A protein has these predicted regions:
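Conserved N-terminal segment of class I S-adenosyl-L-methionine
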Residues: 1-82, 88-92, 102-105, 192, ...
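Residues lining the SAM
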Residues: 92-95, 121
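A short glycine-rich, Lys/Arg-flanked "PGG" loop and its adjoining helix->strand segment in the class I
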Residues: 102-117
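Alpha/beta-hydrolase-fold catalytic nucleophile elbow
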Residues: 121-122, 171
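Short, glycine-/aromatic-enriched active-site segment of Class I SAM-dependent methyltransferases
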Residues: 123-147, 155-157
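A SAM-dependent methyltransferase catalytic signature shared across enzymes that methylate proteins
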Residues: 152-169
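Conserved catalytic loop of SAM-dependent methyltransferase domains
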Residues: 167-203, 226-227
């Protein structure tokens, strides 16, 4: 399930791409598959990186010297890369988990090349507020969401660091009711019939990608997409 749209974040041959907070690898692997690029995934969780490594094995192209894939465990506040290393940076559904997200944004600005592109996604405010209202446990779990962003304020904070915003969209509207159900039945979510049936629907949709649900979600995303996805260009050095 991709949140980032690679038409809005176009990858060019030879690009070095960072997926910050890559989790189990959905975007860093997708970027590698997308073109002849050098993909790097960073996460604090060694367990998630192991899952990413295992998933990547089915996509590896060891004979293609034009592309590479690497993983590293590191803090978003102290990235182990030199200034101006990356052509593209992805940070999807991560900033809401980081206590000092301003520090993470400064690190992103530091490692991104002048003129490079940055994609950030966070949970959309109003669906997220309903999740918080339905269950305290939703945001109190270890590693859970620490804040609810206002997308316009986050955009302004990123622009303040020297970025220009150039695109925005919303994603995953079909997932919103699923998370509301999980929050409503938090204590019994693993056995709740409604939660299980909706999960089956989402798995079917992801595996089969039928036209009906694709059209439905596309029409719903501007209204209730779970994620807001914003794209920025780092200002070139003067």
């Amino acid at each position: 399930m991709k949140t980032v749209d690679f038409q809005r974040l176009p990858l060019e041959a030879g690009d070095t791409v960072l997926d910050l907070g890559c989790g189990e690898g959905r975007h860093v692997i997708s970027a590698y598959v997308e073109g002849d690029i050098h993909a790097v995934g960073v996460d604090l969780s060694l367990d998630d990186l192991k899952i990413t490594r295992d998933r990547f094995e089915g996509f590896a192209e060891p004979d293609n010297q034009a592309k590479s894939f690497g993983l590293s465990t590191a803090s978003a506040l102290a990235l182990p890369f030199a200034d101006n290393t990356f052509d593209k940076v992805i940070c999807s559904e991560v900033l809401e988990h980081i206590p000092d997200y301003h520090g993470a944004l400064r690190e992103i600005e530091r490692v991104l090349k002048p003129g490079g592109l940055f994609c950030a996604s966070v949970p959309r405010r109003w669906p997220e507020k309903i999740c918080w209202a339905l269950s305290d446990a939703y945001y109190n779990v270890p590693g859970g969401h620490l804040r609810i962003f206002r997308s316009d304020e986050l955009r302004g904070e990123i622009e303040y660091l020297g970025f220009t915003h150039y695109a925005r969209h919303w994603a995953h509207a079909l997932h919103v009711p699923f998370w509301w159900l999980k929050c409503l039945f938090w204590r019994t979510q693993d056995s709740n019939w409604l939660v299980k049936q909706y999960h089956r629907l989402l798995v079917w949709d992801m595996m089969k990608s039928p036209a009906l649900t694709r059209i439905l979600e596309k029409s719903m995303n501007p209204i209730m997409g779970k994620s807001v996805v914003m794209y920025f260009r780092k200002e070139a050095a003067s």
